[in-house]
Design a protein with these regions (language model features):
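Short helix/strand-capping turn motifs
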Residues: 1-122
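Short linear, low-complexity motifs centered on an aromatic residue
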Residues: 132-140
């Protein structure tokens, strides 16, 4: 079964940790408040509970060509635990399995640029530097 499709000009935020509903709601509220325009398609589906990168890559590779998405942002235990809600960005297309973290503060910029193909996943992943967390260009 393919991953859920994000709404037009948004990216998919997929919940994989179901241990704290209040934390998920706080993350969704932070996403809603991070930008004037909707930039996320949040999905809370228990079938993705504990899903790892390899499982998501397998699901996506089984999808039809017109159902594939290029990246997904995971709301895993790490994202739900911290006040910055550092989502795990996962490349599903160019370098499948490549990841970096992105605090919600930076998510709207990344989502917008990826959804219109203004920038690509690798540019953000490269800018994440040794910490593995994107905090803007040249600020890590």
């Amino acid at each position: 079964m393919p991953l859920p499709q994000p709404h037009d000009l948004t990216t998919l935020v997929l919940r994989t940790d179901f241990g704290d509903d209040a934390a998920w709601e706080a993350l969704c509220a932070a996403l809603d408040g991070a930008d004037a325009y909707p930039c996320a398609t949040p999905v809370s589906d228990p079938r993705f509970a504990g899903a790892g990168i390899q499982a998501l890559l397998a699901e996506e590779s089984a999808a039809g060509e017109d159902e594939r998405i290029c990246e997904v942002f995971l709301a895993d235990a790490t994202a739900l635990a911290g006040p910055e809600h550092p989502l795990l960005a996962v490349d599903l297309f160019t370098e499948p399995g490549r990841t970096f973290r992105v605090p919600v503060r930076w998510y709207p910029e990344i989502s917008a640029n990826l959804s219109i193909a203004n920038m690509d996943f690798a540019e953000y992943a490269d800018a994440a530097g040794p910490s593995g967390t994107f905090r803007g260009f040249g600020d890590d």
